[in-house]
Amino acid sequence: MDIEKINKFSTKISETYSSELSRAKSSICIFLLGCYCKVHKPVLMRLRKQVVDKKVACLIAGDLNVKEIDDTELPDYSKKFELICNLILNSYRRPVPFIYIPITKAECGDGAKIELVTLCENPKYEKLKENIILFTEDIDTVPHQHKHLKNPHIGAKDEDDFLAKALGRVKTEINIMSDILTRDEENNHEQNRKAFKPENPEGW
């Protein structure tokens, strides 16, 4: 993904939407974090494709191409991670970071754990930290920083289970945003208390 495509996430949303569901989808951005080894990066990319197919903005940290960083002998990926976090924070969309921490395998690093620690320990990322959804295959392997998160972790048995549960959580986030948008615009409090019902539950 090039920088022009990424920049659209920071563009003010001014379109007219056909339904509250469409508007809700356009008001959030899923930010996928995790291990980027040869085993797990394809898992994140599969999830991103499925999320984008649902008309929801979705990024992985590797989307940002920065020549000054990528072309060096030892790329500073922590700097790239900071840049994309800042991009998300400056977006008009509500950021929803998903972190997938799989059981570490021989060929894997601890990228997802490092990202979690970075987000939790940097005060600048308080807004992101509040919205993090943590998916873990083994909670005992997660650094203690996860205790600072407001959301409980979601157990994932393996990659396929993570994909299924992450997509389910995307649906939940769409419902939450739709409810927020409805409350903002409706004066009838009784109407606001009604649960959001997607007009097309099968297709959401």
For the regions a language model picked out, list residue spans one by one.
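Conserved catalytic or regulatory cores that recognize and/or transform ribose-phosphate-containing ligands
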Residues: M1-W204
